[in-house]
Amino acid sequence: MGEKKPEPLDFVKDFQEYLTQQTHHVNMISGSVSGDKEAETLQGAGTEGDQNGLDHPSVEVSLDENSGMLVDGFERTFDGKLKCRYCNYASKGTARLIEHIRIHTGEKPHRCHLCPFASAYERHLEAHMRSHTGEKPYKCELCSFRCSDRSNLSHHRRRKHKMVPIKGTRSSLSSKKMWGVLQKKTSNLGYSRRALINLSPPSMVVHKPDYLNDFTHEIPNIQTEAYESMTKSSQTSGLPRDPQDLMVDNPLNQLSTLAGQLSSLPPENQNERGCSPDVVTCQDEKPFMMQQPATPAVVSSVSASIAQSSSPTSPDPRPAHNQRNYSPVAGPSSDRSAHTSTPSISNSQPSTPAPTLPVQDPQLLHHCQHCDMYFADNILYTIHMGCHGFENPFQCNICGCKCKNKYDFACHFARGQHSQH
């Protein structure tokens, strides 16, 4: 026994030195450093062979392999880890096990010298000190959010960006690199960052959980799938569309298109009038409708008039109407907007074959000749034309205010002061 005794004493001495260093580190932070107490502790650790300075009762060491016990009462598991004496927790390192035991004993040696905060873990104290210094080293790569704790950053990603950490094999690229690749593809396709949300026809709204739950796996394929779906939609519609037109195609514009389709279904009496020999004359004699069924003869005349749109034209004579809630009948450019419709609306008429429209700028389809303004949406064009008066195009159809020119007319609606005269 005389030969085995120095081994546990050396181990106990090393363990006491470790505890002393941890206590000294805490005292350095709190500003209460005492060199005399440290010297006494070190001296007492070298001279005494009992365990007066430790919380654990057992000092004896058994070198028998079948005993399963280590110095200071720590039990080893079958895989060699140190097991907690209070629960089933096991750890390979002694320092980690000591931190875990402090949960059971309630010891909190790491204290803040600026406030009453205390913790059993040194990393918790470091994170707490950032609240005093204002340091925020953790930054979200998707927005400008910064925080002082990593757990707050993870909570921000789940709550704000609907990002769930993926367990298992990680992808070869990090999330920051994935975002860079996505933005590069977006810039090459000519879209802005807004296109990440409005890129899924026909609903045009992609909910974030659909593509951000598996952020690092799914995002590189979003742009390609969306681009293929846009290509298919442009091929099936019969009219080539620009990417910017798809950006404008939000759910509000889709509702406007649906309203245009419903308004394009005329009553039976209008069908009888539309089937008269002089179709163009009949439509010129009644107020502007949101959408009218167009015949191939009308479409051919419209395509011929579009080629001559650069030359100034005089407006057609307007019929005399005393009602204000109707839009005026515009000139040739207005006829183009009245007779030319989107392919989905023109195909909804079973009696007339779908004409193939020539490739042209969609903005030229809705033109106000009075204000010299172009509208890509027929609903907005109809609302705008309803603001013009019949007898005087620069007379407000809401309050009856007479304006001098198109600039005065635009300023009147910009101010929004419609007082009834």
From Swiss-Prot:
SUPFAM superfamilies: beta-beta-alpha zinc fingers. It is found in: Nucleus. Residues 229-238, 339-351 have a biased composition (Polar residues). Keywords: DNA-binding, Metal-binding, Nucleus, Repeat, Repressor, Transcription, Transcription regulation, Zinc, Zinc-finger. One of its GO terms (biological process) is regulation of transcription by RNA polymerase II. One of its GO terms (molecular function) is zinc ion binding. Residues 292-313 have a biased composition (Low complexity). Gene3D superfamilies: Classic Zinc Finger. One of its GO terms (cellular component) is nucleus. A zinc finger (C2H2-type) spans 82-104, 110-132, 138-161, 366-388, 394-418. Residues 35-55, 229-249, 292-358 are annotated as: Disordered. 'Pegasus' was the winged horse in Greek mythology. Belongs to the Ikaros C2H2-type zinc-finger protein family. Probably self-associates. Transcriptional repressor that binds the core 5'GNNTGTNG-3' DNA consensus sequence. This is Zinc finger protein Pegasus. It comes from Gallus gallus. The gene is IKZF5.
